[in-house]
Amino acid sequence: MALSKAEILDAIAGMTVLELSELIKEMEEKFGVSAAAAAVAVAAPAAGGGAAAAEEQTEFTVVLAEAGANKVSVIKAVRELTGLGLKEAKDLVDGAPKPVKEGIAKADAEAAKKKLEEAGAKVEVK
């Protein structure tokens, strides 16, 4: 007569911590496995998944790394993107590397990067 999974789980649920520890040791010996190795193997992918989830950003910063040769076009692009005045945009371009836009969506960051690169700037999205 085989026990069902539910019956096994009920039996385990009724055990004390000491009894569970002894059961695990006996299972390790009988089947030639280590519960610690299984725990590490299970934890490693979970940690990797957590890192992948942490890498999924929702806010991005567009950073002007270099103005490039065509500084006037870059200043115009910065003014269009930010709404800054001529002097403020020129100061931002001259002070590169500097953030142009912060806390924006990925699509907006990519569009801003494209616009600045078309003007001749070197841009990073962080």
UniProtKB/Swiss-Prot annotation:
PANTHER family: 39S RIBOSOMAL PROTEIN L12, LARGE RIBOSOMAL SUBUNIT PROTEIN BL12M
GO biological process, one term: translation
Protein name according to UniProt: Large ribosomal subunit protein bL12
Subunit relationships: Homodimer. Part of the ribosomal stalk of the 50S ribosomal subunit. Forms a multimeric L10(L12)X complex, where L10 forms an elongated spine to which 2 to 4 L12 dimers bind in a sequential fashion. Binds GTP-bound translation factors.
Species this chain originates from: Bordetella petrii (strain ATCC BAA-461 / DSM 12804 / CCUG 43448)
InterPro entries listed in its UniProt record: Ribosomal_bL12, Ribosomal_bL12_C, Ribosomal_bL12_C/ClpS-like, Ribosomal_bL12_oligo, Ribosomal_bL12_oligo_N_sf
Keywords for the protein's UniProt record, in alphabetical order: Ribonucleoprotein, Ribosomal protein
NCBIfam families from the UniProt entry: L12 (TIGR00855)
Listed SUPFAM superfamilies: ClpS-like, Ribosomal protein L7/12, oligomerisation (N-terminal) domain
Superkingdom of origin: Bacteria
Pfam families: Ribosomal_L12, Ribosomal_L12_N
Family, per entry: Belongs to the bacterial ribosomal protein bL12 family.
GO cellular component: cytosolic large ribosomal subunit
Function, in words: Forms part of the ribosomal stalk which helps the ribosome interact with GTP-bound translation factors. Is thus essential for accurate translation.
GO molecular function: mRNA binding; structural constituent of ribosome
Coiled coil spans: none
